Regions:
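Phosphate-binding glycine-rich loops and their immediate beta-loop-alpha structural context
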Residues: 82-92, 96-150
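Short, acidic/hydrophobic/Gly-rich beta-strand patch recurrent on exposed beta strands
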Residues: 10-15, 28-30
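Beta-strand/loop nucleic-acid-binding surfaces
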Residues: 21-40
């Protein structure tokens, strides 16, 4: 599945080798009635019947949705029970973040890391706009997490990133204005993804309005997704959040039994309070998320009791 727009899906046929070819015709497809309201997203592998010639004006039917190997999800905010599937079957999640204009946000990256690990996708941090600021300081925030960091400014070679994504299905996410579409155009010359400018208040202009999978010259796919303003994690469990961050997971080994890691007064001896530097900042941000997720669980328990 390479495109989705208003009840129509674009599908490229493969040759059963497991990797779709980059030069196949895009079939215009509708969802078969027997699939009901099954959510089919970019990255899904599907079975189609009917006219599969790809000629203009033809329409095939999607009759089967294959099991997904990974699912990247998000919610509008941390209290929203409605999950949105960003992409299916991605192997890599390229978290695109500018080091300036707009200023980088550690919270967004960390939330994307949680969603990636929860969805079975391997994250890679891609730092853009290195011509405007030194990316080293922001990259250091994640040094203890073992996440690959690739500097992808317009003056930096794109080959290191191409080496990573070659032969794989990679999804790109990022706030509007961080240079995601520019990066896509470098990965897939001729993709002609629209690029925009950042407004005077540091907010980007949405230039990618629909997700689309683009074939890489060396094999594999780059899935460009619309710029996002929020990355809610209401669908993630508190245990998953802590397991994502190696520095936090190592620290809570020293917590007393029964510690919920929510901090005082409930957990006055939580080991997260003893961390320093980037780990302490991350622990406090994660704690805020844990409080919200715990409130969600308590609310669900109250509903069940009713």
């Amino acid at each position: 599945m390479v495109t989705k727009d208003r009840g129509r899906w674009g599908v490229v046929l493969d040759d059963d080798s497991g990797t779709p070819p980059g030069d196949g015709a895009v079939l215009n497809c509708m969802r078969a009635r027997e699939l009901g309201r099954t959510n089919i997203v970019v990255g899904d592998r599907v079975g189609v019947v009917g006219d599969v010639s790809g000629r203009e004006g033809t329409l095939a039917r999607i009759v089967k949705l294959a099991d997904r190997t990974s699912v990247l999800r998000r919610t509008a905010d941390d209290n929203d029970p409605f999950e949105r599937i960003v992409v299916a079957n991605a192997e890599l999640l390229l978290i695109v973040c500018a080091v300036a204009d707009p200023p980088p946000r550690t919270g967004f990256v960390e939330r994307a890391l949680v969603a990636a690990y929860a969805g079975g996708v391997t994250p890679v941090l891609c730092l853009t706009k290195s011509d405007l600021a030194d990316p080293a300081e922001f990259a250091a925030e994640f040094a203890e997490l073992g996440v690959p960091v690739i500097v992808c400014g317009v003056d930096d070679p794109v080959e290191p990133l191409l080496d990573v994504v070659g032969g794989k299905v990679s999804a790109l996410i990022g706030h509007s204005g961080v240079g995601k579409s520019t990066l896509v155009n470098r990965l897939v010359p001729g993709a002609d993804r629209a690029t925009g400018v950042v407004s005077g208040v540091g907010k980007g202009r949405h230039t990618s309005t629909q997700s689309v999978a683009l074939p890489l010259a060396g094999g594999g796919w780059a899935i460009d997704t619309p710029g996002i303003r929020s990355f809610g994690l209401a669908h993630v469990t508190p245990e998953t959040v802590l397991d994502v961050f190696e520095d936090l997971a190592a620290a809570i080994v020293d917590c007393p039994r029964g510690c919920t890691h929510l901090g005082p007064p409930a957990d006055p001896e939580c080991a997260l309070d003893k961390l320093e530097g980037a780990s302490h900042r991350r622990a406090m941000a994660v704690r805020g998320l844990l409080v919200t997720l715990q409130d969600n669980e308590d609310w669900e328990l109250d509903i069940d009791r009713d």
